[in-house]
């Protein structure tokens, strides 16, 4: 489904990025092990892709014990807008998400802040980490500080759904899944 959805507006690594995130969220329902979740995402994309190699390099950097600041600084240097990359480039943002998930050590706020503080596509990176990690650790483990600010409300520009309850939308989504043919 992620492939079909992403190909409407993305190509190549943009499509792979969507597939990677969808697979991570799906795996997060089964395990809270961050590396297992990231690798499950990688298992859905081509191992010869630049995205696969970039995310794998971040895992390797983390495994070698490099500090978060060093890892994130390398990403910012390689993909700096001044060297020709756009701030919403899939590869650099996937690297930031990977680093945030790994270096955040399942601390919801720290993980999100590592990604957002690195800049680039801040809203997407924070939301991706929040989605993956929130699923992995469960709603009850998300600190109230983060939940209370949202107040179970989603504001959008989608006609008929401009202000909706997040819990109602989650229930509608679950109902849809349960009614879908297997």
Spell out what each predicted region is.
Residues 9-13, 20-21, 92, 96-172, ...:
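Catalytic phosphate/nucleotide-handling subdomain of diverse soluble enzymes
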Residues 48-87, 136-182:
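Acidic, carboxylate-rich catalytic segments that either coordinate divalent cations
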């Amino acid at each position: 489904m992620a492939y079909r959805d992403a190909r409407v507006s993305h190509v190549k690594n943009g499509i792979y990025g969507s597939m990677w995130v969808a697979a991570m969220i799906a795996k997060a329902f089964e395990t809270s092990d961050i590396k297992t979740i990231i690798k499950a995402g990688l298992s859905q994309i081509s191992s010869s892709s630049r995205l696969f190699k970039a995310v794998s390099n971040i895992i390797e950097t983390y495994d070698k014990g490099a500090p978060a600041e060093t890892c994130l600084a390398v990403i910012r240097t390689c993909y700096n807008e001044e060297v020709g990359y756009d701030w919403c480039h899939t590869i650099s943002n996937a690297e930031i998400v990977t680093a945030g998930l790994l270096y955040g050590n399942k601390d919801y706020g720290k993980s999100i802040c590592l990604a957002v503080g690195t800049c680039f596509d801040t809203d997407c990176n924070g939301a991706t980490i929040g989605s993956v990690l929130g699923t992995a650790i469960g709603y009850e483990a998300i600190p109230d500080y983060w939940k209370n600010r949202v107040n179970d409300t989603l504001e959008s520009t989608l006609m008929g759904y401009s202000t909706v309850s997040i819990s109602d939308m989650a229930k509608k989504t679950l109902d849809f899944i349960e009614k879908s043919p297997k």
